[in-house]
Amino acid sequence: MQLVIPMSGVGQRFRDKGYKLPKPFIEISGKPIVQHVVEMFPGIEEVLFIVNKEHFEDTELRIESRLTKVCSNAKISVIDSHKLGPSWAILQASKDINLNSPVVVNYCDFACTWDFPAFRDELESGIDGLIATYSGFHPHMLRNAQYAYLKINDSGNLIDIQEKLSFTSKPMLEPASSGTYGFGTGQILLDAITEQISTGDSYNNEYYSSLTYKSMIASGQVIKKFEIGKFFQWGTPEDFEDFKAQKDFFTYILYYVITQVLNPYFPY
């Protein structure tokens, strides 16, 4: 199985907020975001990072050494800078996609709790696609609920997917994509992306991996959803800063309870 992490965007929103490093390398809980991403996939055989040329050639950023530290045996595909989304990036790196094994495309700006071995088993069971999803309340949805949402039929198959808009007025009751997209083989992935770009399945001129499944649905391929546990969103500066503030608050509360409330009762 191959893990593909497109991280070739410009990251303008973080730049505008004064962040010096590209988003995947900003640290949270003592690790760069991209390391949290890779650690979601223990034991995966192949990892491919897709980075933009501008970042890669900036010697101050040290992109290659940073990525090697995260995953020493990963491939790094360097492509021209663009604003056309992850599917476009993957197509530019197509020579490094493993055509014959299952491929998981994972965005570079979140983490989650989940059962990766179970996800792997289901993707390897012969289906064409598998999308990791979450539902219910998650703190980032207080600010923004504009994510990719799935419509599933009674047989558990994906029949529609759309970006930045829920299908109903109650998005927390719908399956939302976390940003982990499985494809039965790399060939299935590349064929679907080629069709996606040919038909213009994009949002605001960006080719999202969620919308790659549109052509697969139309051709009758089998795509399922896989429910994860907790989802941690770091995609925008606001998401990132909210998470840090919430984590610091609850860490302080835990510290206070242990040191000020419980400690007097258990001095030894």
Place the predicted regions along the sequence by residue:
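Alpha-helical elements of Rossmann-like donor-binding domains used by nucleotide-donor carbohydrate transfer enzymes
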Residues: 91-92, 118, 212, 242
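Conserved alpha/beta core of the MobA/IspD/sugar-nucleotide pyrophosphorylase nucleotidyltransferase superfamily
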Residues: 3, 99, 174-268
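A structural signal for short hydrophobic beta-strand segments in well-ordered beta-sheet cores
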Residues: 25, 150-152, 225
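The conserved acidic donor/metal-binding loop of glycosyltransferases
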Residues: 107-111
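Conserved N-terminal catalytic core of the sugar/cofactor nucleotidyltransferase
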Residues: 2-5, 13-15, 27, 31-105, ...
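Short alpha-helical oligomerization interface
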Residues: 19-24
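Conserved beta-strand termini and adjacent loop/short-helix elements that scaffold enzyme active sites
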Residues: 50-52, 77-81, 132, 164, ...
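Conserved core of the sugar-phosphate nucleotidyltransferase
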Residues: 113-196
